[in-house]
């Protein structure tokens, strides 16, 4: 059963999104689906990201690092406060638990990219990794899927098309199976 962590266009802090999936819905898999944006209006293509266990500042590409930094800052923009007691030790322990589900995340990400092939342009043909805060739920298979660049007029047209949305959703669903 798939469930949404939100039903409209409003902000939910990154940690709360994970809590909703894990504790309200007892999810085994967490997929954060986005439409990307870039200053360069010719940027295009879908991407799939998994967590990097090498630390918040490391990533498999410059693009992955920049995207993770931007996504992780969304809590600051959304007004979420850093929780009391956040420290390096908690992050290290969480990273250790997350490592167990990373292989499954990478496998599932490759499956999704395979199903996107022919459906949409791929920005990256392999699963990228970076320190996305939204993916740091210990023990949960998790991915961030960028469905394309809404800042690109051609992709915006596709991303707002209901049939294309259904096709992307089906590709993600089949990639999970």
List the model feature ranges, each with a label:
Residues 1-177:
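Active-site-proximal helix/loop segments of hydrolytic enzymes
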């Amino acid at each position: 059963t798939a469930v949404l962590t939100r039903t409209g266009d409003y902000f939910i802090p990154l940690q709360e999104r994970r809590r909703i999936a894990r504790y309200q819905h007892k999810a085994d898999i967490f997929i954060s689906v986005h439409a990307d944006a870039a200053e360069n209006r010719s940027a295009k293509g879908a991407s799939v990201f998994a967590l990097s266990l090498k630390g918040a500042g490391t990533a498999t590409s410059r693009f992955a690092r920049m995207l993770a930094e931007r996504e992780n800052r969304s809590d600051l923009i959304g007004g979420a406060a850093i929780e009391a007691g956040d420290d390096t030790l908690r992050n290290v322990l969480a990273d250790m638990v997350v490592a167990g589900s990373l292989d499954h995340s990478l496998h599932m990400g490759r499956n999704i990219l395979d199903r996107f092939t022919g459906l949409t342009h791929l920005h990256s043909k392999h699963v990228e990794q970076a320190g996305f805060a939204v993916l740091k739920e210990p023990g949960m298979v998790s991915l961030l899927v960028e469905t394309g660049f809404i800042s690109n007029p051609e992709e915006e047209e596709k991303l707002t098309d209901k049939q294309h949305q259904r096709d992307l959703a089906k590709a993600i669903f089949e990639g999970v199976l």
